[in-house]
Amino acid sequence: LDANQHAAFERFIRRGGGFVGVHSASDTEYDWPWYGALVGAYFKSHPRIQPATLRVVDGTHPSTVHLPVEWKRVDEWYNFRDDPAAHGRALLVIDEKTYSGGTMKTHHPMAWCQEYDGGRAWYTALGHTIETYGESLFLEHLLGGIRWAAGIAAD
């Protein structure tokens, strides 16, 4: 994005707009600190695609209310430069004991949300593989995040 597009996006959020970030949304715009703060964390690295266990830490959020407490699935598991929950609300964490290549130790958020600069931001690190978009639990997770970011109450 150029400077005008940055300004327009910032204006949108400051006027109460919502942002939804999926997977690689944390792996872009490294020279735009406002965007990094909106997303909540920047990508650091990832191991190979493999199975792992996710744990819901906030089962009241529209993006997690339908999920099992423990959710086993296959994806590309991102490590982040900083703890995304430092400024936001962790919704889903990954158990680093269930796969190889995690670098964040005991608290490794994979989905989170926050009120930011007048608007709302929701992010999920899930969604690398095409198969993910055929999984009903993932699609409900994504829809819940979209609805929350848009300020739409759940049905």
Please place each PLM-identified region on the residue numbering:
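Glycine-rich, charge-decorated loop segments at or immediately adjacent to ligand/cofactor-binding or catalytic sites
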Residues: 27-38
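Histidine-centered active-site/metal-ligand motif
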Residues: 23, 46, 128
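Extracellular ligand-binding/catalytic regions of CAZymes and related secreted enzymes
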Residues: 98-107, 115-155
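Catalytic beta-strand/loop cores that center a nucleophilic Ser/Cys/Thr
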Residues: 41-118
